[in-house]
Amino acid sequence: MKILFVWPKIHNPIYKEFDMEKSLICRVAPKLVPFSKSLTFPILAALTPDKHSVDYVEGDFSQIDFSNKYDLVGITVTTASAYESYKIADEFRKNGSFVVLGGYHPSALPQEAKQHADAVFIGESEDTWPQLLEDLETKKPREYYEPTHPVNADSIPIQRNLQKNQSGFVLQATRGCPNKCEFCSISNMKFRYLFRKRSIEKVVEELRAHKGKSFAFYDDSLTIDSNYTKELFKAIKDLNKNFISYGNINVLGKDEELLKIARDAGCITWMIGFESVSPKSLKSAGKKTNNIEVYEKHVKKIHEYGMSIIGFFVFGFDYDTVDVFGKTTEMIDHCEIDAPLPFILTPLPGTPLYNRLNSEGRILTRDWSKYNLGNVVFQPKMMTPEELFNNAIEAHREWYKISNNVRRILRNLKFGVRTSLYTTVNNFFTKYPR
C-alpha cells in the first residue's frame, strides 16, 4: 500500500506565524537546536512493514497536493485542527483513499470524527496500527480501533525518520502521567494516566540510531520518577548530545543531584508548567505538584547548574482576576524566566474541565478552530471574555518587547552557546501579532 501521514497546521492568535526550520538561526546552527513536530508518525512508520511505502506531509488544506494517490491516509487531529483535518480527510476520501483519524480530539469525540473518516483510532495506536494494516489486506477494516490494554513501553520501536534535513528529533523515555490535572487532555486519555518506563537500554539504542546532536524528550514529565531519570541521564552522557525536556519545578529545584546529572548529560533547557501564580487557581485545577512559594528559589537553582527555563503560564482559572496578569509578569521578571509562554485556559473535549464548564453552561462556542489555547471559548468567572483575551495579548506583548528579549538572551550567554541559542530562538519566534 501507498501510505501518507498528514500533520495539519493550526494558527494561534497569540503567536505570530514563524517557520522555525526555515529561519536563519536554524540554518546557521541546525545541530544545536532541537526542532521536530510529530512523535506519533515516526513510530507508526517504524511499525509499518517495508512492503508498504510511507510519505509524510504537514500543512493546511491549501498546502497539500491532493493529486497524488494514496491507498491509506492517516491524520493526527487536535481539537484546534479538527475542522482543517476533516476538510483534508474529506478531500482524500473523495479521491478514493481510506482515511483514518487519530489523536486527542478523535479519542474524545470518536463519533464526530467518524463522519469524516473510514476508521477512527481511540487512544494509543502502537498496538492497533498493525491490526489496521492486516485488516486492510483482508479487506475487513473496522470502524473504530481502541486498545484493550496499555501499550508496553518497551514495545515502542525505534522511530523512522520521515522528514528530510530534520534538525532535531523527539522521543519518549516514559509515557503517562498520574496527576490528572483538570485541564489536561493527555492524562485524561485512556491509559495515559498510567506511568510507564522504557528500559534505559532501549532509549540509549534509539538515541544512538539518530545521528543528530540535538533532541527533545517529549515525556509528559521526566521527573515523575527521578531515580529512573538519573540513571537514564547517566547512560546517555557519553553520547555527547544536547537536549530539552519537560519537568516539574518542585522536583527539579530540590534535587541538586538530578540537576548536575542532567547538565552533564547535555540538558540545555527545562520546559516547566508553572501554570499560575495563584495558589487557589493551582488547587482548583488539580495541579498538586506545584508550590508557588518556592518558584524563585528553584528557578535560581536550575540556573546555577547552567540550564534555562521555558515557562508555561495559563490565564483564565476560576480564581483569576485581572490582577493575575500583572502578578505573573512580576513573577517572570523577578524569577528571570528565560522564555515565558502565555496560554488562555482551554476546556478541551474529554477533560474534566470541559465537562464541568459544560454542565455549568459556561461553554461559549463549540467552534473547535478556536480551541487553540489563544482564544476565549468559555465564560470566565472573575472577568469578561474580552478582558481575558485582551490582557493575555497585552501580557505577551509586554513579555516579548525587544528590550526584554535582548535582556533574557544576554543573561543566557553565561549558560553557553547551545543554551543561549535555544533561548534566542524561543524569544524571537514567539512574537505578538501586530
What are these regions (language model features)?
Residues 1-210, 387:
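Acidic, low-complexity intrinsically disordered segments
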Residues 2-5, 13-18, 50-56, 135, ...:
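Radical SAM enzyme core and accessory elements
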Residues 100-101, 121, 144-145, 244-246, ...:
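Structural detector of well-ordered beta-strand residues that form the stable sheet scaffold
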Residues 110-115, 258, 319-334:
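Catalytic cores of alpha/beta
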Residues 117, 263-269, 335-338:
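Glycine-enriched alpha-helix->loop->beta-strand junction motifs that scaffold or abut catalytic
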Residues 154-312, 327-330:
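Radical SAM [4Fe-4S] cluster-binding motif and immediate context
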Residues 220-225, 248, 315-319, 343-352:
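Short, solvent-exposed turn/loop segments enriched in Gly/Ser/Thr/Pro and often Arg
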Residues 307-312, 317, 331-340:
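Conserved beta-strand->loop/alpha-helix structural units within folded catalytic cores of enzymes
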